[in-house]
Amino acid sequence: MDRYAVAGYPVKHSRSPAIHSQFAAQTGEPLVYEKLEVLPGTFVASVQAFQAAGGRGCNVTVPYKLEAFEAAARRTPRAEMAQAINTLRFDADGWTGDNTDGAGLVRDIEVNGGVSLRGRRVLLIGAGGAASGALAPLIEAGPAELVMCNRTVARAQQSVQRHAELARARGVALSAATLDDCGSGFDVIINATSSSLAGMPSPVGAQVLRPGSLVLDMMYGPAAKPFLAWAQSHGATARDGLGMLIEQAAEAFFFWRGVRPATDGVMAGIRAELDAA
């Protein structure tokens, strides 16, 4: 059996093993998926040891996505854009890294949420690793406008500058803004900050919404409730990040195995667990 794992610190509560085990059972792929708790300062050595023990690849979660980016021998174009890696494949001539977060987000919005991003006005809140990883796939989806807003606008500007050429090629009006001055009336609003963990209803004002806006928090379950409750109180349609989590996992599975698993049943099962908790 081929071995895969999620590498991070901590990974105790990760749902990745449950998700990938279901993907393996569904597709008939012969693999096992584990948790790899990596102590600070030991990322490369820990992953190398896992590879030496039969590992074929791993997902990478906080706080090691930048270290994975630096350690990879090759990177996919979307990983280069994100400047972060969440999926490593152990090839004979070195590690190949990908970033599946943004692709998972776009697929969740468009396929599971039923909302096409083409021609829409999109607001992305935050400029950390999660937001930066989402930027290129969001641009590729063809919105008319994409605004990245952040508490410190300089960080958002760095990501915007890195993606400026792609945005021009796709005809997307891409810009950076502060949380207090990010515009109004967006069709899709994505929260890539941890504001909900602090119990904050929203890092931006209600002017960003319009009737029927789709609002998504990258957090899922109880962690997303403050932001989503705020959105619903203003008439928006709200989604948490569970779909994104499962869709990015499916992208990683495909990157490793060349087989794309179905996500509906996995999503329904985990949603039922969350609702029952």
From Swiss-Prot:
<feature type="binding site">
    <location>
        <position position="220"/>
    </location>
    <ligand>
        <name>shikimate</name>
    </ligand>
</feature>
<dbReference type="InterPro" id="IPR013708">
    <property type="entry name" value="Shikimate_DH-bd_N"/>
</dbReference>
<dbReference type="Pfam" id="PF18317">
    <property type="entry name" value="SDH_C"/>
</dbReference>
<dbReference type="InterPro" id="IPR006151">
    <property type="entry name" value="Shikm_DH/Glu-tRNA_Rdtase"/>
</dbReference>
<dbReference type="Pfam" id="PF01488">
    <property type="entry name" value="Shikimate_DH"/>
</dbReference>
<keyword id="KW-0521">NADP</keyword>
<dbReference type="GO" id="GO:0004764">
    <property type="term" value="F:shikimate 3-dehydrogenase (NADP+) activity"/>
</dbReference>
<feature type="binding site">
    <location>
        <begin position="14"/>
        <end position="16"/>
    </location>
    <ligand>
        <name>shikimate</name>
    </ligand>
</feature>
<feature type="binding site">
    <location>
        <begin position="150"/>
        <end position="155"/>
    </location>
    <ligand>
        <name>NADP(+)</name>
    </ligand>
</feature>
<dbReference type="Pfam" id="PF08501">
    <property type="entry name" value="Shikimate_dh_N"/>
</dbReference>
<keyword id="KW-0028">Amino-acid biosynthesis</keyword>
<feature type="binding site">
    <location>
        <position position="218"/>
    </location>
    <ligand>
        <name>NADP(+)</name>
    </ligand>
</feature>
<keyword id="KW-0560">Oxidoreductase</keyword>
<dbReference type="GO" id="GO:0008652">
    <property type="term" value="P:amino acid biosynthetic process"/>
</dbReference>
<comment type="function">
    <text>Involved in the biosynthesis of the chorismate, which leads to the biosynthesis of aromatic amino acids. Catalyzes the reversible NADPH linked reduction of 3-dehydroshikimate (DHSA) to yield shikimate (SA).</text>
</comment>
<feature type="binding site">
    <location>
        <begin position="126"/>
        <end position="130"/>
    </location>
    <ligand>
        <name>NADP(+)</name>
    </ligand>
</feature>
<comment type="similarity">
    <text>Belongs to the shikimate dehydrogenase family.</text>
</comment>
<dbReference type="InterPro" id="IPR041121">
    <property type="entry name" value="SDH_C"/>
</dbReference>
<dbReference type="GO" id="GO:0009073">
    <property type="term" value="P:aromatic amino acid family biosynthetic process"/>
</dbReference>
<feature type="binding site">
    <location>
        <position position="61"/>
    </location>
    <ligand>
        <name>shikimate</name>
    </ligand>
</feature>
<feature type="binding site">
    <location>
        <position position="101"/>
    </location>
    <ligand>
        <name>shikimate</name>
    </ligand>
</feature>
<dbReference type="InterPro" id="IPR036291">
    <property type="entry name" value="NAD(P)-bd_dom_sf"/>
</dbReference>
<dbReference type="GO" id="GO:0009423">
    <property type="term" value="P:chorismate biosynthetic process"/>
</dbReference>
<feature type="binding site">
    <location>
        <position position="241"/>
    </location>
    <ligand>
        <name>NADP(+)</name>
    </ligand>
</feature>
<dbReference type="GO" id="GO:0019632">
    <property type="term" value="P:shikimate metabolic process"/>
</dbReference>
<dbReference type="InterPro" id="IPR046346">
    <property type="entry name" value="Aminoacid_DH-like_N_sf"/>
</dbReference>
<protein>
    <recommendedName>
        <fullName>Shikimate dehydrogenase (NADP(+))</fullName>
        <ecNumber>1.1.1.25</ecNumber>
    </recommendedName>
</protein>
<keyword id="KW-0057">Aromatic amino acid biosynthesis</keyword>
<dbReference type="GO" id="GO:0050661">
    <property type="term" value="F:NADP binding"/>
</dbReference>
<comment type="pathway">
    <text>Metabolic intermediate biosynthesis; chorismate biosynthesis; chorismate from D-erythrose 4-phosphate and phosphoenolpyruvate: step 4/7.</text>
</comment>
<feature type="active site" description="Proton acceptor">
    <location>
        <position position="65"/>
    </location>
</feature>
<comment type="subunit">
    <text>Homodimer.</text>
</comment>
<feature type="binding site">
    <location>
        <position position="86"/>
    </location>
    <ligand>
        <name>shikimate</name>
    </ligand>
</feature>
<dbReference type="InterPro" id="IPR022893">
    <property type="entry name" value="Shikimate_DH_fam"/>
</dbReference>
<dbReference type="GO" id="GO:0005829">
    <property type="term" value="C:cytosol"/>
</dbReference>
<dbReference type="InterPro" id="IPR011342">
    <property type="entry name" value="Shikimate_DH"/>
</dbReference>
